[in-house]
Structures are given as structure tokens and as C-alpha cells.
Amino acid sequence: PSLSFFQESSEEYQIPKLSLLQNIHSSTKNILSDDALNENARMLENVLDDYGVKGEILSVKPGPVVTLYELEPAAGLKANRVISLADDIARSMSALATRVSTIPGRSVIGIELPNDIREKVLLREILSSRAYGDSNYQLPLALGKNIGGEPVVANLARMPHLLIAGTTGSGKSVGINTMILSLLYKLSPDQCKLIMIDPKMLELSVYDGIPHLLSPVVTDPKKAVIALKWAVAEMEERYRKMSKMGVRNIESFNLRVKEAIKNNENFTRTVQIGFDENTGEPKFEEQSIKPEYLPFI
């Protein structure tokens, strides 16, 4: 089998509109009043006191799924003493589960209790946030919200590898689609190209035909091997280009290309044009080539 590649499109890419995504105001919000949060904090202090744990709840940070209570333990109280009470705290607070852990760099202990109503974290809300819109990440991924309800955006370009795992129905496909849309809402096809391999033929078929694809969504395992071999060859070719340019990454390479285009410069490459008739030695010549940006793949 052979792998077919799309031809470059001359049409100008338009970033999708956020209005295509579900509206923020249509989702269920879990908004607790300050009085309710303070009441829960006092109740938690009483529960801890019943188990002989003295301390004070300094702050309460409600998130979309859990609420974080920051406990300042009394002097001499070991953190392991509080951590070992996680199951008892959950039972006393009528919660399904409780997570208790120390907070690095601080003297407080974090106690996470699940909210009665889980708030939906919508992609539109993350993509419209400053954390995503103002980020200078090359490949931004909208991952959701942290425990404090703040948007979490990661840079795929800084990840050597990314493994997504989980049980059936845990949200792996939703996570992958969220990451793909994060790239499509930020980068044009000239900046980012995608190779999608989907042996199940169900997960990624909706993306067939988008301009970012180097080839149609690969569903044949044999063609998947060809696609991966092509990616390795392309990687090695890019290493050679960057080595010749004296740069270490795609971002630096594209900056060099930008300068060359601005100064009307051309790059050169050495190609073999044949063999010398007398000596049989290979003959080379320098060819001038137009500088072109390297998209992320």
C-alpha cells in the first residue's frame, strides 16, 4: 500500500469562530456563597478536632470538581497524621472520597473535598481565556481547569512524549479532541500539519478533509507504518536542515527563514549532478532555493 498526500491549498485559512462551540452560559455552574464555604470550613475544622487534629482552615478555593481547604496544623502536628485520616474525613463529611496532601513550598496541608455538583468545563471557556489567547506557546493545548478553577494550558512542543490512558468512558477521546481543536483554533495549516492514525476508524474520521492534514486519516495499519516511516525520514531531513543552518529547533529555523525573506536572501544546497567522466568521482553543484518555513508536524 502507498500513502497519498494532499496538495498544498492556496486558500487563506480562517480560524474557526468560538461561536461554533457550546456557550459558557448554557453549562451548569457550581457557585457556592462565601457563607456556605465558610460553614463547610468550620464543619471540617470540627471533624478534624474530633480526631484530635488541631489547626485552622486558612483559605477555601472552590474548583469545578473539588474544593481545596488549606489547613494550617497546630505546632508539632505531623502531616502524616492528617493524611492517614483521609477516609475518616470523607465519611464524616459525607463525601465519596477525600484527598489530603502537603502543598510544596508552604506550611499548610491541602484537603480536597468533591463538590455536590460537578461543574462542566467547556472548551469555549478555556479557548476564550487569556491563558490560551495570550500564550506564546508554539503548540498550545487547552487541558481544562486546575483545582482553583483557573484555565490550564500546556505547550505540546515542550513535551518529548504524551501518553493518554484511562478506563472506558473516562474521557480519553474527549481529551484528544480537545487537544486537536486547541491547535486548530490557534495555528494555520502553514504553521502546523497533522498526521492522524485511527485504526478503529471511528475516533478521528470527523477530521478528514481539514487543511491541516498531510494525508487522509490513516485507517489501514500497513499505511500507518508507511506514515510513521515517512515521519522519521522527515525528522532526519529537518535535523540536517537545522544543522546546516546552525539552529537547534524549528522555532529558531523559522526565525532565520523570516530574516532571509525580509532581506531577499536565498538559501543554497549542495546536490549531486552526476559523475566525472575521467575520474568517476561524483560531481556536485550549489543550487539556490527559496527559504520556506517549516511547519510543526
Q: Model-flagged regions — what are they?
A:
Residues 9-16, 103-108, 112, 131-262, ...:
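P-loop NTPase catalytic phosphate-binding loop
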Residues 1-153, 158-161:
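Low-complexity, intrinsically disordered P/S/T-rich segments
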Residues 265:
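Catalytic-site microenvironment of enzymes
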